[in-house]
Amino acid sequence: AITEPEGAALDDLEGGRGYWAPDISYYKGRFYITATYRLNDTGNVYRKQIVVSSDKPEGPYSKPAIIDEDGIDPSIFNDDDGRRYMLLNRGARIFELNEDATKQISKAELLFYGDNKRAPEGPHLLKKDGYYYLFEAEGGTGPGHRITVSRSRELKGIYEPCPYNPIMRQNNPDEIIQRCGHGKPVQTQNGDWYMVYLCGRKIGDGYSILGRETALDPISWTMDGWPIVNNLKGPSALQVKPDLPEMIWEDESDD
């Protein structure tokens, strides 16, 4: 999405810095990508947020807009009344954005600190059937990583934790797929629901040599209106792919 070196602004950054945790969303004919821009450890705010947008998912995208709110794991939520918000970690913190999501127009405030209360991050909001559903990654990024969900009738809460939490977690230390968390719900054009989340495959002595990978499992909705992932069985090592048209993308890079 960021193709020009001057727009990327990666010069002189130390190892492990740069862009973290990108998230994509759609609003009024445009695709929005937001990510954390991790600077070196200087200044008052060294984890800023960027937003780029395009009318096509493959781009070209706009120049990055910088939002000077410290945190990680940004996501954008668009409410029914047209107001737009960004969420960040340290629980689920929220602040309002302007119409084109290039400026912060309110102070950040805490929605909910999570159900597990340990390292809550990766917040995403979904509005469905009159509820705001708040998804969070909790438990740290090791074996205790998990996805929890809470809900409220009002955007600013009070949020009620799901009685089935965590709705995604690997409980078997011997399984190959571990460290499951930071999930985002998506609905296909056929009406089916899925959870996109990160995980790590434990190879040999426990290292995930491919780092964090992307996983997909189905979401079902309980009679009392809660989303659960893969029938609460944890991550699936093999899953039937969604029945959707295939998309062919060509990599035009010379590298």
Q: What do these predicted ranges mean?
A:
Residues A1-D255:
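Carbohydrate-active catalytic/glycan-binding domains of CAZyme proteins
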